[in-house]
Regions:
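N-terminal secretory signal peptides that target proteins for export/translocation
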Residues: 1-9
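Bacterial N-terminal signal peptides
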Residues: 10-24
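Active-site nucleophilic cysteine motif
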Residues: 50-65, 93-105
Length: 184
């Protein structure tokens, strides 16, 4: 029996030899695939809000940047909306309104359309609607990405990033069938 045959009698050494041969073959032909963290996935194509009451600005920045190819920051939207509204009203309301968003997009040469009493099915026909929801008793704006095959509404949420909730849960927190849509 040669040295290789004797080596194969020892299980640990056999795996070391086989492991070296296998790893050499793998190293010769590496597989390259981009890896993203959970944070990157959660924040993909979402402008995350930096301030407690800036969800409207971040949601609008998300829609302008990713749906209308008009890159803008949350801060720029906030400052722009403050120029077209009464800051005291914003403070009393606890944030911006859909009318504030409308005035801002008009300064950028776009149109803003507000809806009320929409049905859920009608909402799903709109392109990147920003909707007000009730989040634990507080008003909050999110972007609806659509209803997926799993029966969940996928959201671009300025506070929590991309996530999904059941259609029933969404309907229970969606305020008055309201939506805001930016058009060309």
């Amino acid at each position: 029996m040669g040295w290789l045959g004797r080596l194969m009698l020892f299980p640990v050494l056999r795996w070391v030899v086989l492991g070296i041969s296998f790893s050499s073959a793998v190293a010769a032909d590496p597989i390259r695939k981009p890896v993203r963290s959970l944070l990157e996935i959660r924040e993909d194509r979402v402008i995350v809000q930096k301030w407690e009451t800036s969800c409207a600005a971040a949601a609008l920045a998300t829609v302008l940047t990713f749906s209308h190819n008009d890159p803008v920051t949350e801060k720029a939207v906030t400052m722009g909306m403050l120029r077209t509204t009464d800051p005291i009203k914003v403070k009393v309301r606890g944030g911006f309104s859909m009318l504030d968003m409308k005035h801002f997009v008009e300064t950028r040469g776009l149109n803003g359309i507000g809806y009320k009493n929409l049905s859920f099915d009608d909402l799903l026909t709109l392109d990147a609607p920003i909707v007000p929801i009730d989040f634990q008793g507080n008003p909050h704006f999110v972007v609806v990405r659509g209803l997926k095959g799993d029966g969940e509404v996928h959201l671009a949420d300025p506070a929590f990033g991309n996530h999904a909730i059941s259609a029933e849960k969404f309907k229970s927190v969606w305020k008055d069938g309201m939506a805001f849509v930016v058009t060309e």
